[in-house]
């Protein structure tokens, strides 16, 4: 079992229940999924860029990403409908907790000039989105083998009903908020 999953089940559930004043342990919010998204701007002109992004995402997430395609043509961006423009991965279960552990314990401390995540990035329903500017903060990505620096979006979807519940959950997992 993943370290953070067992920590959540054994200690954090009770701690969050008391902190939020919930009556039942089943009301305690939990993380349902983590979605990683990497948009590759120049993928419409150069197919190799997308292959590099897929390789990086596979190394980071531990599973093969699905290639995202443009929903409609936009002349200003020089893309057509159905052209590949990025990739995404949805993590659930054990892999989700393993990724969260690596994110909190290894990747976040390696971010340059990091002063904590903004508490304003909650969506009103307890879900949290954050952006990572460089994929090299993850130890799985070999610095010598990358073709360019890419960023990614990380969305943590929770079962929380409000931002306060979501913040309490992520703080218990060790997320550094400002």
From Swiss-Prot:
Keywords linked to the UniProt accession: Ribonucleoprotein, Ribosomal protein, RNA-binding, rRNA-binding, tRNA-binding
Q: Which GO terms describe its biological process?
A: translation
PROSITE patterns found in the cross-reference section: RIBOSOMAL_L5 (PS00358)
Which Gene Ontology CC terms are recorded?
A: ribonucleoprotein complex; ribosome
Xref: SUPFAM superfamilies = RL5-like (SSF55282)
Question: What's one GO MF term for it?
Answer: structural constituent of ribosome
Q: One Pfam family for this entry, by name?
A: Ribosomal_L5_C
* Source species, domain of life: Bacteria
Q: Does the keyword Cytoplasm apply?
A: no
Q: Which family does it belong to?
A: Belongs to the universal ribosomal protein uL5 family.
State how it assembles: Part of the 50S ribosomal subunit; part of the 5S rRNA/L5/L18/L25 subcomplex. Contacts the 5S rRNA and the P site tRNA. Forms a bridge to the 30S subunit in the 70S ribosome.
Question: Main role?
Answer: This is one of the proteins that bind and probably mediate the attachment of the 5S RNA into the large ribosomal subunit, where it forms part of the central protuberance. In the 70S ribosome it contacts protein S13 of the 30S subunit (bridge B1b), connecting the 2 subunits; this bridge is implicated in subunit movement. Contacts the P site tRNA; the 5S rRNA and some of its associated proteins might help stabilize positioning of ribosome-bound tRNAs.
Record's protein name: Large ribosomal subunit protein uL5
Q: Which organism is it from?
A: Psychrobacter arcticus (strain DSM 17307 / VKM B-2377 / 273-4)
